Amino acid sequence: GGSCGQCRVDVHSGGGEILPTELDHITKGEAREGCRLSCQVAIKQDMEIELEESVFGVKKWDCEVISNDNKATFIKELKLKIPNGESVPFRAGGYIQIEAPAHHVKYKEFDIPEEYRGDWERFGFFDIESKVDEETIRAYSMANYPEEEGIIMLNVRIATPPPNNLSLPAGKMSSYIWSLKEGDKATISGPFGEFFAKETENEMVFVGGGAGMAPMRSHIFDQLRRLKSKRKMSFWYGARSLREMFYTEDFDELAAENDNFEWHVALSDPQPEDNWEGYTGFIHQVLLENYLKDHPAPEDCEY
């Protein structure tokens, strides 16, 4: 707890002193006004708190797994069906929370296509088991955008222990999500979030890598497909190799349809079979050297 900084609440009385874990996300001025992270506040007395109005729009849904497919070696796309007649009124860039019950997951039972199994076998990941004796809740950004109705789509990277110490515990939630199969049930709540696009005409620069694809896809599709935005925008995405790329056809299609949008990929570890002639290195450095460094006004862009 205390790592994402999203669960802000104003505590007007009670709650005790603010904790060091909270000060990574809350300024001293905000703390003086009573701002806290709700996940870090122990309820030991009567309290007076103030919540954002949007919190009261949060609901819970029991969903059904439509699919749970590998999009990269360590990333799955979990697609959930919202109950008939229901909808999750989220904004692009928002997130939901998903619940995992107590579980015992064996990685050898994961459904992983042959093209991705090599690294799993080389690192010994199929020997991992996740044993969790309590309910776990984690937050994930939506990869779909609001007009893709009736579903919730997540990009989930498996949190394995390091290959040199497989005795360490695996990620509780990612292990559970990777074990889900078509027809299984999953409980989510939401929507939440503050990572929303500003309604301006400023240039937009999207930067992401790995499972950070999710909010990028949601934002970009929302801007171009729903809002029909004519703002200049570019997407800079980093992956290890071509095998780790996904949604390529989606973004190629968007670029072909919209003169105001372009996207770029940088590979940090291209493989010989990739025959890669594009950008190499880490995406933030590639973005700086190949675009922002010579941009006339990078400070006016929205990132």
UniProtKB/Swiss-Prot annotation:
Which reaction is recorded as catalysed by this protein?
a ubiquinone + n Na(+)(in) + NADH + H(+) = a ubiquinol + n Na(+)(out) + NAD(+)
Segment Catalytic: which positions?
201-303
Entry annotated with the keyword Iron: yes
| Enzyme Commission no | 7.2.1.1
Domain 2Fe-2S ferredoxin-type spans what residues? 1-45
Where does the chain bind [2Fe-2S] cluster? 4, 7, 39
Q: What is its main location?
A: membrane
Which domain of life does the UniProt lineage start with?
Bacteria
Query: What residue ranges carry the coiled-coil annotation?
Result: none
This protein's cofactor list reads: [2Fe-2S] cluster; FAD
Free-text function comment from the UniProt entry:
NQR complex catalyzes the reduction of ubiquinone-1 to ubiquinol by two successive reactions, coupled with the transport of Na(+) ions from the cytoplasm to the periplasm. The first step is catalyzed by NqrF, which accepts electrons from NADH and reduces ubiquinone-1 to ubisemiquinone by a one-electron transfer pathway.
Per UniProt, subunit arrangement is: Composed of six subunits; NqrA, NqrB, NqrC, NqrD, NqrE and NqrF.
Q: Which NCBIfam families match?
A: nqrF
**What is the name attached to this protein's record?**
Na(+)-translocating NADH-quinone reductase subunit F
- Originating species: Alteromonas macleodii
Q: What is the lineage of its organism?
A: Bacteria, Pseudomonadati, Pseudomonadota, Gammaproteobacteria, Alteromonadales
